[in-house]
């Protein structure tokens, strides 16, 4: 596994969906992460970038969909998602647009 020096190379983007917005109310945030990163690296990156306390990290490797084109079949790239749960006394992450009500 290659070493990743900058924590911003681990977190690629927030996942914006109905399910991820529903989890925000429970203190769980969803991110697209680098496929080679592990749970410890993800935890350290979130704590450094956002200044919060992470209690748990769950990861999921997602297969890219097979899509049909006029020249045959292609495939979207595989992605890795991380569901990061913050501690109860931690401040919310504002990258998702604030509170959902």
UniProtKB/Swiss-Prot annotation:
InterPro entries: Nucleotide-bd_a/b_plait_sf, Ribosomal_uL23-like, Ribosomal_uL23/eL15/eS24_sf. Keywords: Ribonucleoprotein, Ribosomal protein, RNA-binding, rRNA-binding. Transmembrane segments: none annotated. One of its GO terms (biological process) is translation. Pfam families: Ribosomal_L23 (PF00276). GO terms for molecular function: rRNA binding; structural constituent of ribosome. Coiled coil: none annotated. Belongs to the universal ribosomal protein uL23 family. One of the early assembly proteins it binds 23S rRNA. One of the proteins that surrounds the polypeptide exit tunnel on the outside of the ribosome. Forms the main docking site for trigger factor binding to the ribosome. PANTHER family: 60S RIBOSOMAL PROTEIN L23A. NCBIfam families: PRK05738.2-4 (NF004363), PRK05738.2-5 (NF004364). Part of the 50S ribosomal subunit. Contacts protein L29, and trigger factor when it is bound to the ribosome. This is Large ribosomal subunit protein uL23.
């Amino acid at each position: 596994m290659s070493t990743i020096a900058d924590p911003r190379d681990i977190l690629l983007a927030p996942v914006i969906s109905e399910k991820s917005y529903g989890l925000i109310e429970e203190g769980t945030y969803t991110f697209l992460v680098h496929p080679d990163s592990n749970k410890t690296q993800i935890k350290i990156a979130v704590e450094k970038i956002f200044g919060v306390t992470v209690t748990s990290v769950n990861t999921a490797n997602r297969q890219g969909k097979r899509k049909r084109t006029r020249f045959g079949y292609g495939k979207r790239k595989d992605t890795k998602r991380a569901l990061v749960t913050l501690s109860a006394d931690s401040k919310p992450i504002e990258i998702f647009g604030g509170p959902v009500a």
